[in-house]
């Protein structure tokens, strides 16, 4: 496993970031400047709250491709904590949300850095065989 860019801290949390490969893929992140980008366009209140209130710099996340061949592709690190997502208030952006008032975005985003691509994808079917992952929301019906 590759080294993480900052020392582990005792309160590190682990997250799952899902993206459709046609919208934003692992390769898009890997090819971004410094392998870093913002995780924008999230329009789910629970996910927004996690990004805004709980994701901390140094936390790690699994990068999950949804779609035809779903699975965990790589590991990312949160490098900037939650802040307002300006795509929500830009009418020209595909993530525009007319419910956001004026320049005030009700949505949040974090910045992430690609740490490591896994040697092979970890599939949903494989995750379902692991008893220690039984309570993982991703594995529950209706959570994908």
Q: What positions do the PLM features span?
A:
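Contiguous surface segments at macromolecular interaction interfaces
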Residues: 1-29, 36-37, 44, 85-144
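Short alpha-helix capping/helix-loop boundary micro-motifs
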Residues: 40-51
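Short, well-ordered loop/turn sites that connect or cap secondary structure elements
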Residues: 52-56
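Short beta-strand or tight-loop elements
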Residues: 57-59, 108
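Short beta-strand-centered aromatic/proline hotspots
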Residues: 60, 71-83
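Short polar/acidic secondary-structure junctions
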Residues: 66-68
């Amino acid at each position: 496993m590759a080294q993480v860019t900052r020392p582990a801290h005792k309160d590190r949390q682990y997250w799952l970031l899902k993206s459709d490969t046609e919208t934003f893929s692992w390769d898009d992140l890997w090819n971004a400047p410094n392998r870093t980008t913002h995780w924008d366009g999230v329009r789910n209140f629970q996910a927004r709250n996690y990004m805004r209130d709980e994701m901390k710099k140094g936390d790690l996340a699994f990068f999950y491709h949804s779609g035809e061949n779903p699975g965990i592709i790589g590991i990312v690190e949160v490098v900037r904590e939650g802040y307002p997502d300006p795509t929500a208030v830009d009418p020209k952006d595909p993530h525009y949300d007319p419910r956001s008032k004026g320049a005030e975005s009700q949505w949040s985003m974090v910045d992430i850095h690609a740490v490591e691509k896994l040697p092979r994808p970890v599939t949903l079917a494989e995750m379902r065989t692991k008893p220690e992952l039984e309570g993982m929301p991703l594995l529950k019906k209706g959570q994908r």
